[in-house]
Design a protein with these regions (language model features):
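Enzyme catalytic cores with a strong preference for nitrogen-chemistry domains
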Residues: 1-162
Length: 162
């Protein structure tokens, strides 16, 4: 932290469609590069683990399982990383498929942020595969506290969700 600010970075790793293992390695390479620059908040694109253009492959258990396994691998490989990391993947939950950003911190999955607006026009027909998160689908959990003022000992809890 410098002057009360943290370093934030958005990464765009090389992505191979439906090759979660290769994409995970590219994500880890980017994370390690950002670590060298002392980045504390790392954000990756939606579906960076699977690739955005998987279309009907998103409905295949094999791809969903591979994406989940790779998320666990990325979490394990970043247990020593002092940063909050967001990576995108498809996630099945309660019978629905969501486009989510998974939040990772020190090797733990601390939450998921589901996409709320699912486009369905022109080349975007995500509603064919994905559900949008409704308020009743989202559970808010306290996962981060930020100090308001160094002189006060007042802390605000930041809700996690959409």
């Amino acid at each position: 932290m410098k002057h009360g600010f943290i370093k934030v970075a958005a990464a765009t790793p090389r992505v191979t469609v439906a090759d979660c293992k290769a994409n995970g390695e590219e994500i880890l390479k980017a994370i390690h590069e950002m670590e060298k620059e002392h980045v504390k908040l790392m954000v990756f694109p939606e579906f960076c683990i699977t690739g955005y253009t998987c279309h009907d492959l998103f409905l295949q258990r094999c791809l969903l399982d591979s994406a989940w396994d790779e998320l666990l691998h990325i979490a394990e490989e970043t247990r020593e990383t002092d940063a909050l990391i967001f990576v995108g993947l498809p996630l099945r939950h309660r019978g629905k498929l969501y486009n989510v950003a998974a939040a990772l911190n020190h090797g733990r999955i601390v939450g998921f942020v589901p996409k709320t607006y699912i486009p369905n026009y022109n080349e975007f027909y995500e509603q064919r595969q994905f559900a949008g998160a409704e308020e009743e689908d989202v559970e808010f959990v306290d996962f981060l506290k930020c100090e308001k003022n160094e002189e006060d000992e007042i802390w605000d809890e930041i809700p996690f969700g959409t």
